[in-house]
A protein has these predicted regions:
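Conserved histidine-centered catalytic loops in small-molecule metabolism enzymes
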Residues: 131, 214-257
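Active-site ligand-binding patch in enzyme domains
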Residues: 17-38, 42-171, 180-183, 253, ...
Length: 257
């Protein structure tokens, strides 16, 4: 009997990348996801970001939210946008929504925010460095789960947070943070995949936000490079996907946004 090995090996690995990563490391597979214009802006100089991409790209994002276990943002995103972070696909119920994770080192998330008010219906985790149980209680009573991490540069220790999430059985996280949290995730070396939705628009603006902020790199040679890149057309927009060649751990201070 003749046996052929490694048939469609790369395709199978890609299809099961979350499972393989979680089984080998017991840590979530983290996808850094953002939408930007052709000139690299995630919002206008006024902060307006609805919508950067078109309907096809946004529908793809919600299919991703339906597929992966959790979605994570920083408290800055909650304060700026008051998002629900749900899966808005036709025919889906609350059970299809991802677990929502907020990185909030000092517990600034408003109790009246949509996320906290819906925490009893949709699983919600607040990751914080604040150890004051009295400050935890209003969130717990609202239905949130509190995870306390060590403090790293004044912010949530993302590596420790991933360890705790893995222990809870969360095998995958879509990171939809702002530029500072995205930089922190790259700095912590927790990102396994990058998904950039690129719109056929130009926003301009010196003060307009970009997908990755923080300190930045000194030279192009220091940059995080992606391998196994793939480009997919989504209506008038594009999805560019790739995998960081190596984890960078000396990239400046951690931040949340």
């Amino acid at each position: 009997m003749e046996v052929t090995e490694h048939v469609l090996e790369k395709e199978c690995d890609a299809e099961n990348e979350v499972f393989f990563h979680y089984m080998q490391t017991k840590l979530p597979f983290v996808i850094l996801k953002y939408a930007m214009t052709l000139d690299g802006k995630i919002a206008t100089y006024t902060g307006a970001s609805r919508w950067v991409t078109g309907e096809a790209a946004r529908a793809h994002v919600h299919r991703m939210r339906n597929r992966y276990r959790a979605i994570m943002v920083g408290v800055g995103t909650v304060l700026a946008d008051d998002p629900m972070l749900t899966c808005r696909l036709k025919g889906t119920e609350n059970g299809a929504n991802p677990v929502r994770i907020i990185c909030d080192s000092t517990l600034r998330t408003p109790l009246e925010s949509q996320i906290v008010r819906s925490a009893k219906e949709i699983p919600t985790i607040l990751a914080t460095c604040n150890r004051q149980e009295a400050m935890h209680m209003p969130y717990i009573e609202a239905g949130c789960k509190i995870l306390v991490t060590p403090e790293k540069d004044g912010h949530v220790d993302l590596s420790d947070l991933m360890r705790q999430l893995g222990q809870l059985g969360i095998d995958s996280v879509i990171l939809e943070g702002g530029g500072t949290l995205n930089w922190s995730a790259l700095q912590a070396g927790i990102v396994q995949k990058v998904q950039a939705y690129v719109a056929s628009k130009l926003f301009g603006g010196t003060e307009a936000k970009t997908p990755v902020e923080g300190q930045g790199f000194h030279t192009p040679a220091d940059a995080v490079e992606l391998t196994r890149t793939k480009i997919t057309a989504l209506g008038s927009d594009w999805l560019i996907e790739g995998y960081p060649v190596e984890n960078r751990r000396n990239m400046g201070c951690l931040q949340e946004s």
